[in-house]
Amino acid sequence: MKKLSGIGVSDGMALAKAFLVKTPEFAVNKYLKHQLTKAQAKRLLDSAFKKAVKDLEEIKEITVNNINTEAGMIFDAHIQMLNDPTITEQLEQQLAQNVHPVIAVDTVFSQTATMFSQMQDKYFQERAADILDLRQRLLAYLTGQKPHDLVKIKSDVIIVAHDLTPSQTATLNKKYVKGFLTEIGGRTSHAAIMARSLEIPAVVGIKGITTKVKDGQIVGVDGRKGIAGLDLNSKDTTEWKKQKALEEKYQQELKQYTNKETVTLDGHAVVVAANIGNVKDMELACQYNTNGVGLFRTEFLYMNSQEWPDEETQYQAYKAVLEQAHGDLVIIRTLDIGGDKKLNYYEFPHEDNPFLGYRALRLTLDKQDIFKTQLRALLRAADHGQLGIMFPMVATLDELLQAKQLLNQVHQELGGNKQFKLGIMIEIPAAVLAANTLSHHVDFFSIGTNDLIQYSFAADRMNKNVSYLYQPLNPALLKLIYLTIEGGKVNDIWTGMCGEMAGEPLAIPLLLGLGLKEFSMSASSMFKARMIIAKLNYTECQTLAQKALTLANAKEVEKLVEKFFKKKDIFI
C-alpha cells in the first residue's frame, strides 16, 4: 500500500472507490474580445447573481435539513459576500469601462481571493475558498454552464478533487460519500467544517492526489492521521477495515467529552474556549459547547465594510456574541489590521517589512478616533455578558499604558461603571521578557503562538523555504511560554493561549504542565482537547514540561510526549 500524507480535517476512516472531480474551466480569456452594451452586461450580471443567490438559498435549506442550522449559516455568509458593497462597487467600475461580465467577475473575485489567501492568519487564508466558490458559481451561469454540484452520486465513493467548494461539500449525501481527499485546503476552511458536521472523514493538502488516483480505483481515507491509502492489496484492505472499527470506537469515546468543564484526573481545572471571527462562528462554537471565547478577531467587521464600521454596527456584533456566551468570558481583540490584512477604503503607507511595521495597536494608537469608536462599542456591549478586552501586538509598557489611558478616557465618558477584564496578546519576544512588568497593568495574558514563533525564529511560516523553522515544540519556544506564564504569576494573573498550538495534541500536556489556564482553539478541536486533558494528571504534566525544557530540539520533545502518551494509553 502506498500512503500519501496531508492534513486530517475530519476524523474517521473509510474505504471505497474513488470519484474523481474535475475542476471546471471557463476559458475566460475568450471573452476579452466579446462586446456587450452596458445595459446587456448589467442584465447578464444581474441574472447570474440572482441565480447564484437562489442556488445558495436552496443549498442552505438542504444543509439545514441534512446537517444543522449552524452549517446552513455558512451560506448566509456567502449571500452576504455577493451583496458586499466593496465587491459590487468593483464590478460596477469594471462594467463602466466596458469590461465583459465574465472578465469582471473573474478579476474581482480572483483578486479578493488572492488578498485573503496571502494573509498570515489561517482563518483568513481559508476564506479565499469561499470567494472562489462564488466565482465558480457566477462564471458557470455567465458562460451558460451548470454549477458542478455532487448531489447525483448514488453509490459508495470517496471524492478525490483539487479542492471542494463549501457548496459542493454541503450537498454531499453521506449515505454514499464515505470521505474525501483534496490537494488544497485547511482545518478551518468551510469545506472542512462541513465534513466534520457531516461526520465524513476527510484529508486535504495532499499534493498531486488527482494525478495519482484513477476514477473507480479503491482508496482509503484516515482523517485523524491525515493519510490517504492507495494501491491496497487484500491484506491492506483487511487491516484498513480493522483499523476503521477501532477508529469508530474512538470517535464514540470523543463524544463523551461535551461538557464545558475540563478537569484533569487530579482535579486541576482549565478552560477550553473557542477562537471566532464573527457572530456565525460563535453559533458553531456553541454547538461544541464552548466555555466562552478566547479570541474574537474583529478584523472581519472592518474588512467586510466599505468604510470604517460605526459604533452601532460594532456594538450589535459584540453584543450578539456576549449574549450567546451566557455569562462565560468573551475575549474580544481590538483591531489587528495591517501587515497582510488590508482595507479597501484605507491606503496603508508603503513599508519594506509591513509585518514589523504599522499594524495592530501601533495603527490604532495613531488613529485614535477609530480606536475610541471600537472601545465605546466594546464597553457598551459589556452590559450583555462577561467581556474581556485584549490589545494585540504589545511590544512595550509605554504602548500598553497609552492604550489603557484611551480606554479609561472612553470608560469615563460612558459613566465609568462598566465591568470588564483587560488583557494583552503576548506575541513579541520583548513582551515575554517584560511579562513581570506588564502583568502589573492587566488582568490576563493570551499567548499568540503563530506570531511569537515567527518573530522568535525570524521565519515567515508562509515562506516554504524556511517553513521548517515553524516549530511549536522547540524547547526555546516552550521557555518563552514558561517565562510568560511565570511573569503573569508574579501579579497573580492567568495566562491563556489563542494560537494554533493550543489545540495541538502533542503540545497540550506540555502547556498544561507549564501552567497554562486557558486553551482557545477552533471549535472542532475542543472535544479532542477535553478528552486529552481529562486523561492527564496535572502533577505528571508539570514534571513532563520541566523535562521538555531541558531537551535540545523539537524532535526530542515530540518523542518525549509520544512516549508519555503511549504509557498512559492516550491515542491522538
Curated annotation (Swiss-Prot):
Question: Which coenzymes or cofactors are required?
Answer: Mg(2+)
**Disulfide feature:** none
Question: Where Mg(2+) is bound, by residue?
Answer: E427, D451
The residues that the entry says bind phosphoenolpyruvate are: R297, R333, N450, D451, R461
Location(s), subcellular: Cytoplasm
Q: Which family does it belong to?
A: Belongs to the PEP-utilizing enzyme family.
Miscellaneous: The reaction takes place in three steps, mediated by a phosphocarrier histidine residue located on the surface of the central domain. The two first partial reactions are catalyzed at an active site located on the N-terminal domain, and the third partial reaction is catalyzed at an active site located on the C-terminal domain. For catalytic turnover, the central domain swivels from the concave surface of the N-terminal domain to that of the C-terminal domain.
Q: What is known of its domains?
A: The N-terminal domain contains the HPr binding site, the central domain the pyrophosphate/phosphate carrier histidine, and the C-terminal domain the pyruvate binding site.
Name of this chain's protein: Phosphoenolpyruvate-protein phosphotransferase
**Protein species of origin:** Mycoplasma pneumoniae (strain ATCC 29342 / M129 / Subtype 1)
The root-end lineage is: Bacteria, Bacillati, Mycoplasmatota, Mycoplasmoidales, Mycoplasmoidaceae
